[in-house]
């Protein structure tokens, strides 16, 4: 059976989170889930789409014997702060604060902390290795290129798709990336 508790982790802002576990009888390793870009909630739902992506990942990790924390990014859902003005550095700090909070719990093995980041969360997980002692990181759907290159490539793909539309013709793309 999976137990879940809603918690608030406070520092300069309050982060609404859910901690999931089988029991608190012994120290267990921790997985911190960090979601991708946007205002998706801690369960993985956004804009009317209920996917429960992060809830399902959490359940999987708990079944494997981990304690799992997933949280709402700053300025979204049950977290305070300003989503629009929060920087990447702020997001890394928020994740680090959650790790520090979790390491103080008597049922967390502070030597066995793993971060699982999806999309933008993969970037945050990677940056966390600079300041946090982690047992490992799991990167899901992380970028394989810089943000500028990714945006240029997305523009290129949109241009290609529009070119294939019947009855429409664009003379040239807004930006043609070097490939």
Which residues does each PLM region occupy?
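N-terminal cap/lid segment of alpha/beta-hydrolase-fold proteins
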Residues: 1-26
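Alpha/beta-hydrolase active-site loop
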Residues: 85-105
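Accessory cap/linker subdomain of secreted extracellular hydrolases
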Residues: 140-179
């Amino acid at each position: 059976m999976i137990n879940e508790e809603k918690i608030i982790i406070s520092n300069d802002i309050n982060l609404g989170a859910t901690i999931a576990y089988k029991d608190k009888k012994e120290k267990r390793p921790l997985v911190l889930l960090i979601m991708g870009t946007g205002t998706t909630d801690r369960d993985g739902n956004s804009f009317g789409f209920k996917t429960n992506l992060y809830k399902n990942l959490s359940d999987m990790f708990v079944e494997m014997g981990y304690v799992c924390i997933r949280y709402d990014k700053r300025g979204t859902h049950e977290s305070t702060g300003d989503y629009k003005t929060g920087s990447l550095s702020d997001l890394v700090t928020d994740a680090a604060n959650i790790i520090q909070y979790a390491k103080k719990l008597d049922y967390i093995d502070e030597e066995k902390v793993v971060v699982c980041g999806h999309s933008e969360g993969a970037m945050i997980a990677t940056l966390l290795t600079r300041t946090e002692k982690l047992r490992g990181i799991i990167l899901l759907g992380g970028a394989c290129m810089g943000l500028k290159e990714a945006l240029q490539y997305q523009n290129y793909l949109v241009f290609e798709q529009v070119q294939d539309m019947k009855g429409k013709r664009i003379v040239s793309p807004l930006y043609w990336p070097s490939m």
